[in-house]
Amino acid sequence: MTSSAPQQGDSSRVRDLRIAIVHSFYSSATPSGENQAVADQMAALDRAGLKPHLVAAHTDRLSRSPLYPLRAAVTVGSGRGHSPEADLRRLRPDVVHVHNLFPNFGSAWLSNWDGPIIATVHNYRPLCAAATLYRKGATCTLCPDGDRWAGLRNGCYRQSRTATAPLAWAGRHGAPANPLLRRADRIVVLSEASRQTYVRAGIEPGRLVLVPNFTSDAASPKGVGSGRRHDRVDAPWVFAGRLTPEKGLMELLVRWPASERLDVVGDGPLLEDCRRAAPRAVRFLGAVQYSELRERLPSWRGLVFPSRCPEGAPLIYPEALAAGLPVLAFPGSAVADSVREQGTGMVVGWHEPLDAALSRAADHFHSLRPHCRSVFLRHYTERIWVNRIANVYSDALAHHAAVREVPSGGGPRVPEMEPRW
C-alpha cells in the first residue's frame, strides 16, 4: 500500500509537548516541495496546539558568504559545522523532529542529544548523492547496492565529482551508518515505496513509520467536489514540477500528441530543451505562486505525472486530489502506485500510444473527480496527518524511554541490518 488508513489517534495525548522542528531550508531560487511541507506542518502543529518551535538554517542567507561552498562541503563530509544544538538546549523540547540537515547543519550533535528524535526522509539522500536514485534515464541503485563510490565516479550531485565527493564520503558506510537514521527513534517515510526502499537498504523496519504528506483544504477553491462541472471539453492537461531530467517531462513532450493541449507549470535547467521538443499545443507558464496553482488546479482536465524516478511522495498528488483532479501517471513512482491503489486516475506505460491513452482518460476523468476528493478527505487532510504524527511522537517517547532503561554504555543502539535488494 502507498498510504496507510487514517489512524484515529488523539493529538491531545501529546498536546503539552514541546516539539522542535529542525530543517535546513533549500534555496528559494528553486521551489521546494520539502520547504513547503515543513511550513505546512509547522502551521498544522500550531493549530492543533502542539507547540512547535522551528530551528532552521537558510541557504538563502548562508550562501551570501564567499566561503559558503567550502563550509557546506566540510559540513556534509565531516558532519561537523553549523549545529542546532545550542538552540535545542535553550528550547529544551520533549521531542526533536528533523526534516533535513543537508547541507547547512552538521550531524555530530546527534550523539550528544539525549532526547527522542524523529526523522522524516523526504527523499533518498542517505542512499544516493543525487537523492533521486536516478541516473541516465533509469532508476539507479548502485550506491545502496554496495558500490559506494559509484556516485562519485559519475558525478551524480550537480554533475560534478567535486560537488559529489563530500556526499560520497559521508555515505560510504551505507544507510544504517547514517548518523540521523541510526540515531532516530522513529523514521517517517512518505510512501510505501520509500519504506520498502529503506528496508532494502538495511534500515530496521520497526523504526519506519508511514505518514503521507497532507495538504490544506483551505487552499482549494470553493465548490470543488460539489458535483459542479469544473472541466471543459477543451480544457488542457497540466504538468507541474521542476524541469529536470528525472521528472520525465522531456520524454513526455516527444510523445505528446500535437492535438492535445498541455500546460507546463514550473521552471528548471531543461526549460529551453523542453521548449524545443514541445508541440505547438504545449504552453509554458513558468513558475507560478503556490496559491495561484492551487486555485487553478480544478480548471485542468487532469494532472500528468511522468516522473522517471522513484519519488517519495510529491505534494502535487494530494494537492490534485484536494482539487478533485484525476492523475495520469507513468510507472516507476510512488504516485503511480497510489493512482493504481486508490483508483484516482490511470497509469499508462511509456510504450503505449499516448494519444489513445489520453482519449481513454478524457472519457472517464470527469466522473472520477468526486472520488478523488473522497480519497483526499480519507487520507490526506491536515487533521488525519496531525493524528498520525501525534502517534509517532508518542511512540518515539515510549521507545526512547524503554531504550534508556536498558544499560547501553552510551545511548541508544540500533541493530544494524545488511542491505538486501
What is each of the regions a protein language model found here?
Residues 366-385, 391:
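A short, well-ordered alpha-helix in the C-terminal region of glycosyltransferases
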Residues 126, 141, 145-222:
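Donor nucleotide-sugar binding/catalytic pocket of nucleotide-sugar-dependent glycosyltransferases
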Residues 272-294:
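Nucleotide-activated donor-binding/catalytic signature segment of Leloir-type glycosyltransferases, i.e.
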Residues 305, 317, 322, 326-329:
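Short hydrophobic beta-strand element within catalytic cores of glycosyltransferases
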